[in-house]
Amino acid sequence: LVLIAFIFNIILVALKKWTKFRAIFTTGHVQVQQASTAFWLILFCFPALGDTPILLIMALLLGLYWAAGTNLTVEISQDLTDGAGFSIAHQQMFGLKLFSWLSEKMNKSGKRQSKRLEDMQLPGFLSIFNENMVATSILMTLFFGAILLLLGKDYLIEAKFLAEGKSFLFYILTTCLNFAVYLSILQLGVRTFVGELTQSFQGISQKLLKGAVPGVDCAVAYGFGSPNAVTIGFLFGALGQFLAIGALILLKSPTLVIAGFVPVFFDNATIAVFANNKGGMRAAMLWPFVSGLMQVFGSALIAGWVGMAAYGGYLGMWDWAVVWPIFTVLMKYLSYFGVALVAIFLLAIPQIQYLKDKKGYFLVTEDYEAYKALKAEK
């Protein structure tokens, strides 16, 4: 199934003269996760359908979703990286486009533009937060330290996280500081990865799929813009999720969502990086918080409705908590007409993008310097 959907994605890009798709979804582990979740959602919508028709519908919709989603992030990725030659292929592609657009609108409509995090210089002793490693270490110590203190030493020993007789304080410090170290390693390695990937993809984009770019894991964005945006996005996304979880408890929701690290971190950190690039610090704090709320409420609704809550979990990433529940409603209540509507919607996305910027649409991937010159003239 993943292979068929991937080939369909490639065909759509190969026919870009008509389809207007420009990016290929290359994040393999994400493709497998999404195929598993899509299978359940489509089976829920068409329980009496045979294996082959379900697989065909899945391949069609996933191939279109991968092509449309990665295509949505082309311009914002090129803008963030100054033409590095990739787009984002992950679980929050529609969210990245939406929040980037909202960030830009918010910054333009405000009386005073919000500075980007990388442009801010804190005064006095606060200047230590200008260094990403220090800022992340302190913030994570406060954040995770508070959680670990609430859990308590006895619980950590019982759960075998902490050995008997070991220092509880030292465990908190090393756990929090390790997070900062691992994040720094991830950010440092990203630029090397991007350089190698774009170089290896050049042959394909020049010979076989002219002007196409690879859609890659969202973590590649962490090597661009402000490193502190990653930490800010994680913290405010977590606050949004915790608030939403509290609301579910107060409202006695039949489905209770527990915050998972991957949706909290990778969705909201990535949203913050792109939001900061378009709208500065305010956007980097606001939109991950809103995203956290949407992740929890959306996941609770869809997981409870389709029955996945009974099996212990759901892929609570942004697109699958917000966009795919809408697709599922259309397919459930409109049957094959709903499938057609979803397919038409995904096919229409690049067409609309193209109509909004005919001159620059393909130029942004083929010659970014010329694209910037074109935009400067307007």
Predicted regions and their residues:
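Signature of multi-pass transmembrane helix bundles
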Residues: 2-196, 208-217, 307-378
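Hydrophobic alpha-helical bundle architecture
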Residues: 14-22, 218-304
